[in-house]
């Protein structure tokens, strides 16, 4: 993709010609009775068949999956390609859970070990979270979740005969070929195919948000395995599910996420986890509850810049799954309200827990203009910066420049909303920034 390619928010409804043709052909086939089955029984049956396993775990909950599937079937109005992708994604999530439960059953030592300390990057979408995440990943002692691991956190080949012989000690590189050499891991190949498919279906999406198979990825994808996650509302029109999610205890999702992180660090240890997702803004209390040693990095950017950028990103994501449901104004109003809600939840936790000294605040402009200063401030929490680390961070930044895949231009008027709509939803947050935030590099 050319670096000077311009992707505009007004172009979110555009799709490649072959994508439109495929959908038309598939719709014709659908009239003849060939449609992806999005019923729970069909999805679980397919996952069990693909893995040869049956146990989803004693803590598996039916309600989140039931509510999500109902909302998808009744509200999302998926086009045929979107329905196919969704079915395969659901089967993969269930299969990952089946494999995880088998791993836990055969290897009790996985869950007995403590979770690594964690640095958690949170903040609204488009505030520099991805940049900071990828910079910190350049420190090899940090344990990051790579995209191929996020898609398939559990090894694919877990035949019982192999499980019996795996060593429980992480220091001895306990796994067989699949995780010992990532280049030979089938999960890497699967993630590469997913990356290529996204490039074909949405050629301009990488200019908005690159999704690379071997790059750090958001750990919200681990929460997806519990079907308690905001990923669906970021990619589909599922208002009933989204509303239910806001009133539902997310504790079980974070409890299971900790299990998966322990499984992942058992496969590949590290000094600390570097986790990242805007989703966590709503649930800082749960991270504090389920993580023993955690520090939060809250990224900040002018809300009238970051929120319109994310609205454009969400709209471009939506058309991968649906034609009819890609209403820009509906998407914009949902996410303006939602981001205001996320910020209020995050501020509520901070206000009630000021004594814990858990937060470092990072401004977008400082991160973009002086990343070395920001990183030096971060590493003051861990013994200080070294010249070797600075060189690694500098190299990582050069390899991942802004606008690497093109230029993203966005305007609120493309979605029928006003700047005042954003300002009205973010009053408390903007006052907090004005009165309290100091850039750690100063």
Question: What are the functions of these language-model segments?
Answer:
Residues 149-273:
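PAPS-dependent sulfation machinery
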Residues 252, 280-286, 304-307, 368-371:
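Flexible loop/turn segments at secondary-structure boundaries
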């Amino acid at each position: 993709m050319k670096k000077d390619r311009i992707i505009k928010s007004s172009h979110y409804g555009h799709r490649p010609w072959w994508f439109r043709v495929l959908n038309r052909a598939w719709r014709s086939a659908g009239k003849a009775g060939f449609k992806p089955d999005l019923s729970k029984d069909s999805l679980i049956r397919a996952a069990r068949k693909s893995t040869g396993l049956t146990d989803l775990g004693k803590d598996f909950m039916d309600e989140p999956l039931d509510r999500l599937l109902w909302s998808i079937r009744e509200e999302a109005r998926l086009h045929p390609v979107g329905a196919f992708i969704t079915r395969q994604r659901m089967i993969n999530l269930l299969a990952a859970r089946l494999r995880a439960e088998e791993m836990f059953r055969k290897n009790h030592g996985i869950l007995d070990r403590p979770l690594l300390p964690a640095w958690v990057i949170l903040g609204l979408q488009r505030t520099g979270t991805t940049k900071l995440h990828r910079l910190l990943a350049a420190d090899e002692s940090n344990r990051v979740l790579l995209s191929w691991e996020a898609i398939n956190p559990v090894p694919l080949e877990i035949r019982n005969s192999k499980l019996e012989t795996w060593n429980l000690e992480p220091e001895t590189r306990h796994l067989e070929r699949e995780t010992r050499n990532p280049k030979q891991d089938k999960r890497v190949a699967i993630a590469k195919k997913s990356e290529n498919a996204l490039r074909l279906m949405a050629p301009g999406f990488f200019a908005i948000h690159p999704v690379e198979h071997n790059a750090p990825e958001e750990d919200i994808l681990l929460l997806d395995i519990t079907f308690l996650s905001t990923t669906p509302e970021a990619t589909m029109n599922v208002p009933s599910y989204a509303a239910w999610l806001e009133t539902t205890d997310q504790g079980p999702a974070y409890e299971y996420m900790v299990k998966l992180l322990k499984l992942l660090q058992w496969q590949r240890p590290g000094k600390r986890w570097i986790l990242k997702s805007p989703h966590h803004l709503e649930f800082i209390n749960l991270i504090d509850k389920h993580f023993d040693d955690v520090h939060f990095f809250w990224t900040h950017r002018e809300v009238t810049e970051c929120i319109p950028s994310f609205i454009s990103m969400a709209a471009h994501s939506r058309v991968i799954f649906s034609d009819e449901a890609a209403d820009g104004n509906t998407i914009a109003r949902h996410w303006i309200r939602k981001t205001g809600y996320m910020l209020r939840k995050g501020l509520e936790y901070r206000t009630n827990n000021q004594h814990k000294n858990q937060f470092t605040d990072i401004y977008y402009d400082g991160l973009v203009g002086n990343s070395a200063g920001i990183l030096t401030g971060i590493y003051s929490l861990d013994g200080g910066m070294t010249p070797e680390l600075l060189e690694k961070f500098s190299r990582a930044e050069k390899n991942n420049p802004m606008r690497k895949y093109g230029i993203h231009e966005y305007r609120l008027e493309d979605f029928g909303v006003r700047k005042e709509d954003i300002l009205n939803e973010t009053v408390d947050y903007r006052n907090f920034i004005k009165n309290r935030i100091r850039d750690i590099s100063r």
